[in-house]
Amino acid sequence: MATLKDRLVDPAGWSDLVMGNWAVARAMIDSGTRVVTSYPGSPTPEIASALELVPEEKRSYRFDFAANEKVALEVAAGAALNGHPAAVFFKSVGLNVAADSLIQLPLLHLAGGLVVILGDDPGANSSQNEQDNRVFARMAYLPMFEPATPQEAYDLYREAAALARKLAMPVLLRLTTHVCHARELVTVQPCASAPPDWTPRFDPTTHGPYVPITRSVFPMKRRALERLESVREVAESAGCNRVLAPNGAAPVAGKRLGIVSSALPAMAALEVLHDGGQPVEILKLGLSHPLPRKKIAEFLASHDEVLVLEELDRVMETEIKSLAWDSGSKAVLRARTDREELMGELGPQRVRALLARTWPEAFSPGPPTAAPAGEPDAVPRLPQMCPGCGHRSAFHAVKAALEKDSITVADIGCHTLGFQAPYEIGQVLLCMGHGVSTASGLSIGNPARKVVAFIGDSTLMHAGLPGILDAAAHDRDIVLVVLDNGTTAMTGHQKRLGSGEDGGAKVPLKPLFEALGVKFLRECDAYAQAQLTAHVKEAMAHPGFAVVVARHPCMLKLTRDQKRKNPAYQTRPVAIDQGRCDQRHTCVAEFGCPSFVRGADGSVTVHPDLCIGDGSCLQTCPVEAIVRPQRPGGAS
């Protein structure tokens, strides 16, 4: 049986159960995309995982991780300028980083076409907010496709790539968390049989202008608007913009009811109609910008009441209300009225309740969901650092150096979890790379309270360097603790730029900091807790900018790598010497490794399936009750 790795490059068409991200990866390959770039971020990283599975000799494409989303977009755009079909993907908030370039790209002629894949995150499942990136399509004059299923993710990527090449422009493909991670039987087309064409085609004398000086901006913007208007004609006849009537169409309580929707809410509405049997039609939009105005006007004209059903912001609602006014529609437009409905994902349960509030004569809210009889509710579990994580060891050491009134600033990454007990480090968080700059601001006019910022090595390369340069140039009175685990761990252990793992140059942090003007710099292993505590105390006493690097490899990645190299590899969990343990619970209450289990009688044991035997906890027990068991044969 063929593996998914083999399926990705199978030249024949096939059908298989795959997740949405894998479907997109296959669509890239069989539609002839030549250059793909990314900065890792949920919910899209499995696209990268799939692309990286293909051996180099079988790839018809070049795939690279970039320093950040802006760089990733610009590399892909440069390839598209040169005539190579290109794509870039990143998470929702990554578009904030790339926005400077995204807004400008529609003004250019991108001969190869460019698909920009956005991993939006309604519900903020793995993001610091749930921003709605549909507004960027309006701001940048860009078409946007919105798949609702893995099959549509595959199909609409192919349509987006074809449209981007035809019009020589960027096209947005907006995925959401459910579409990325849902699995479905996906049918794919055969791969393009022609060999990759790497002929460079950029010619600054044709299809210009390419430089937006004042006299060129209007012609460039005019071209962007004309291209967008041509896409509106495509939207009117696109097969992905269609009316669905699972139960036919008939008046309900004397009114013809309709729904305009897209993406996950459209599928949720279909499920509700399937369960309830109401004869309500849905105009489902797969190409949601520009809106197919004629098709929507016709839909409004054939219904008495129409609900605009969408997640997050009132994007379609605002535009459809304007369209209804312009067209003189007599249909009553309904929309969300509860503030809570502007937050989170709209699954079947929430859509059913929303429909019941909108049309109580046609829908009932349904019974509340409950755990099956006899089954207890799941115990709430906060996210936490893995057993053996060097960040835990670092936080335990740093906390011993902090003063009671110290201000601590978090950043994005696994170390964000330090804000929870027992560490409680990281009192404010904005976005990637903000930590050192926000700490700089907090230090101004604040001589009595030391500000300590934290940043991971991947985030540092992504967006931390300008803040470090600023802090060094102004000699801000702050401490920066760099937690270096050598990878981009939180999103799946993608190769960190500058680590050397991707075959590129290795960029050591010490000379980088020195080049940025850092004068006070200390380094040690995060497991060397006494040394790290001493370094942080010294840094806090230093007047001005001080940097401490706490380095230890991600232990989850390390143990997985060891098991791949040697299937017989086994970890050796630590143990509790019950004769020494006085049940003061430092291991649980202060160090906080989830491998320690406190019993009802107060005793502590080690969970053998969780402990990886790293030993970072040995130095934390005041009575040395945490011990390494002897190996067979008596060796310790």
Q: Where would I find each of the regions flagged by the language model?
A:
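Thiamine diphosphate
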Residues: 1-150, 178, 248-253, 279, 417-549, 555-563, ...
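Flexible, low-complexity linker and terminal segments
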Residues: 2-21, 25, 31, 147-385, ...
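Short acidic, glycine/serine/threonine-rich loops at helix termini
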Residues: 47-50, 75-77, 98-102, 125-131, ...
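Short helix-loop-beta junction
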Residues: 50-57, 270-282, 446, 511-518
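A glycine-rich helix N-cap at a beta->alpha junction
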Residues: 58-66, 108-119, 199-205, 473-486, ...
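Short beta-strand segments
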Residues: 89-90, 115-119, 172-178, 260-261, ...
